Amino acid sequence: MSRHALVTYFYQSAFTVSLKKTLIVFSYRQTGLSQLAPEQQLSEKDFQGFNNILVFVPNNSLTHHDRKAIYSWKPSFPITYILSEDAMKDTPDLPHIRVCREGDSFSVAQAKVSVFGSTDTGVSYLVEAEDVCVFHAGDLNLWHWREENTLREITRAEESFYDKVAAIPKDKVDICFFPLDPNQGGLYDAGANHIIMAIRP
């Protein structure tokens, strides 16, 4: 089978993956985006032509859950929202919302979704659609600050992160979205380097 995916980056952890019949939206954030001109933001014209639109919210933080934007899209579009449990607060009553937690696995809108853990709040997602496998880490990362943390704190952070990553299938992921935060200081990319070697996207 021929595989094709178009990846669009918006801001912070916000990405879309456009397949032939499926649009996958991760952590879309629009509120307060001075970096993007209005014509660069995701709009309903971008939804046209897709049979299924999957909108993933990995946690309830403002970085990942822009309620004003994502729930304003017309209900006539074939949109399914997949939310972590903590993101359900103040969510409008819409017909196509799926709430999930770590360890869940289910099929929705002709896609298979596996839900993995996080080392912060919420979850991470593995999505398989149209023979393409995409992983979005949410806030899963090796959260350590080498200049500030004690050795014990760093060790605990490493153990927690390695444990979460070990659950993700190897040699299966085609596209991996993972956070990088230079505010962590030295070795801020340690988590990204590890997940690349571990799951080999």
Where do the protein language model's features map onto the residues?
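Active-site-proximal beta-strand elements of phosphoester/diester hydrolases
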Residues: L6-Y9, I24-S27, K112-S118, C133-D139, ...
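Metallo-beta-lactamase
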Residues: F77-V132
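Active-site environment of divalent metal-dependent phosphoester hydrolases
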Residues: G32-L33, N60-K68, D86-T91, D104-F106, ...
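N-terminal pre-catalytic "stem/leader" segment of glycosyltransferase-like enzymes
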Residues: M1-K20
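A short helix->loop->beta-strand "cap" motif at the edges of active sites that frequently abuts
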Residues: T22, P75-T80, M197-P201
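Cap/insert and terminal regions of metallo-dependent hydrolase folds
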Residues: W145-P201
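Pre-active-site segment of Zn-dependent metallo-hydrolases
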Residues: T16-W73, L140-K170
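A short acidic, amphipathic alpha-helical/loop segment
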Residues: R67-W73, D93, A190-I195
